[in-house]
Amino acid sequence: MSDEIVKYSNQFNNQALRKFTALDLDLLMAIASRVRDKGTDEVAFTFEELKRLAGLQRNMTNDEFAKQIANVNRRLLALNFEFQNEEHDIIQFALFAGFVTSPTKRTLTVSVNSRFSFLLNDLTSQFTRFELAEFTALRSSYAKECYRRLKQYRQTGVWKVSLEDFRRLLDVPKSYRPSEINKYVLKPIEEELGPLLNLKVHRKYLKKKPGRGRASLVGFEFEFDPEKVPGGKGAPRVDLSRSVRE
């Protein structure tokens, strides 16, 4: 499993995977690692293979595992993936054209939507790449989702994101105040990704005039050890210049 690589278009990182559990994310990335560069061909997994790829440790019956797999696609279908093309048309789509789970055969068969196979096929630039085993070893769903975004900027070692986008991308409850974001979101991220990537999280504040109260949290800068990729180009950074004043 150590050789399995997940690779997809950076556009996939713009989609928040709402209500996905840590196991849901592991299964989705395991599937993504195998359908990559297969075009729209059907790809079949045995349950045992999929469990191994996802690093699943708990014991589950075939029926339980089939329901877990089906839940992943239900959540994908509920998301309404969308992006804008060069003509600025807003296009919504389902990622998989076929997603067949068979408890009796103990198999999953999937095929990627033909119109949007570009997300997982023939990627030469502007893509996110990481090791599946490293991803599945993470425990927190917040750490997993942050990890994916950091890997988009693996050559620069910096991800800048506004508070608004951070909430959306990591599906942070709207009710969370900064103190709760620190405790329930950033703490597991720092605990797991700090040692792994030498991650440092810098909080960005909008300074107010004297006597106008405390500065407001407006974003984050995630700094980590960049990867060295021979002949590669660095990924673009997110511009926070309009909303962040250090």
Task: Describe the residue ranges of each PLM region.
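Charged, alpha-helix-forming regions
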Residues: 1-246
